[in-house]
């Protein structure tokens, strides 16, 4: 029996990936990753050149991204079916082999894997490897500390405004 291993890739530079993530990716026989329709996918791009020959890839292609408002019933329904489908597929593969799911940043910080994680509870063995978040990479790139001493930091989620053509 295998398991589903979601590994955080960090902010986009393979040098900022954990040693454990690197090892899991290089030895994986099955790798899954999210992507927009017709694109390679950012997570897949980050690991380019790291995958073993003959690896089986599962491109989890989003059925919609920004075409519908994220809070509309149609968007919620389409994505729920998408995540249900991929939870089923990954659970099936994990019955006989490990599957490494690639996740940009950290899987539990606004990561798409969270939607699979909740659906896979009790159906498959799951392991999650943390990654450096994108925002952490950003503030380190500035060379300035983001907080000092008793500072409080708040993270707010936001979406880009839709184009008004």
Describe each model-derived feature in a short phrase:
Residues 1-14, 19-21, 26-125:
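Class I S-adenosyl-L-methionine
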Residues 105-165:
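Class I SAM-dependent methyltransferase SAM-binding "motif I" and its flanking Rossmann-like core
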């Amino acid at each position: 029996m295998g398991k589903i291993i979601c590994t955080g890739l960090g902010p986009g530079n393979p040098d900022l990936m954990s040693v454990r993530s690197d090892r899991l990716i290089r030895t994986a026989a099955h790798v899954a990753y999210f992507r927009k329709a017709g694109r390679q996918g950012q997570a897949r791009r980050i690991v380019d050149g790291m995958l073993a020959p003959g690896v089986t890839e599962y491109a989890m292609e989003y059925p919609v991204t920004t075409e519908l408002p994220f809070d509309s019933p149609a968007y919620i329904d389409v994505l729920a079916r998408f995540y249900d489908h991929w939870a089923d597929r990954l659970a099936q593969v994990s019955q006989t082999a490990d599957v490494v799911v690639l996740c940009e940043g950290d899987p539990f910080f606004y990561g798409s894997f969270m939607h699979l994680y909740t659906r896979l509870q009790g159906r498959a063995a799951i392991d999650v490897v943390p990654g450096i978040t994108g925002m952490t990479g950003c503030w380190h790139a500035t060379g300035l500390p983001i907080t000092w001493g008793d500072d409080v930091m708040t993270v707010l989620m936001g979406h880009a405004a839709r184009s008004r053509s």
